[in-house]
Design a protein with these regions (language model features):
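Short N-terminal edge-element motif at the start of the domain
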Residues: 1-46
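A eukaryote-biased signal for long
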Residues: 103-177
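Long acidic/polar interaction regions in large eukaryotic complex-forming proteins
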Residues: 60-134
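Aromatic- and glycine-enriched beta-alpha-beta binding-site module
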Residues: 34-79
Length: 177
């Protein structure tokens, strides 16, 4: 068996906003660690830790790939929309109720009070509680009309925004062909 010492090609960018910067309120520090040999990005920050591996690609340098990806692509790779947004869920459910359910269920004359009752569902409710409350308020509502809106976690959105605004321009500058 042969043991070989490998000195990996890793590049790290550290970002620490100044106390007066707007970003300081959402993220006080973040490190973007690019493992160029394996095509992996690790993001460590006080807004959360995220990681994704693209794998090695002999046809494109990893830093070139990182210089050209867009934020929504990166966000989708490092996270998933799993945070329940009850405010947006209420709005979409009320829209669905007005568009599809009011005539079908014969509740057009009570629509204003029904929508008001949906708006008053506790803003700290879970998605399951929200769903059950809407079903209680509007018996017979089609389950597909009860919209459960999920978003990416705040921390993931923050580190991707910082990547696009500060790190990616630096990568382009440092690795311009």
């Amino acid at each position: 068996m042969k043991v070989e010492r490998i000195i990996p090609r890793t590049i790290t960018y550290r970002l620490v906003p100044d106390k007066g910067d707007d970003e300081c309120n959402s993220c006080m520090w973040v490190r973007y660690i690019f493992d160029c040999d394996n095509g992996r990005l690790n993001i460590n920050s006080d807004a959360g830790d995220y990681s994704y591996g693209w794998g090695y690609n002999e046809h494109e340098d990893f830093m070139h790939l990182m210089s050209r990806i867009n934020g929504s692509y990166l966000l989708n790779k490092i996270s998933s929309p799993h945070v329940f947004n009850i405010g947006k869920s209420k709005v979409k459910t009320i829209e669905n109720l007005e568009l599809y359910e009011a005539d079908y269920l014969g509740i057009k004359n009570r629509l204003d009070s029904i929508c008001e009752e949906i708006e008053y569902i506790d803003s700290l409710s879970s998605e399951e509680t929200f769903f059950k409350e809407v079903e209680r308020i509007v018996p017979g509502i089609d389950w597909e009309s009860v919209e459960i809106v999920k978003e990416y976690p705040y921390g993931a959105r923050v580190v991707v925004d910082l990547f696009e605004r500060y790190i990616q321009p630096k990568i382009r500058e440092d690795f311009a062909s």
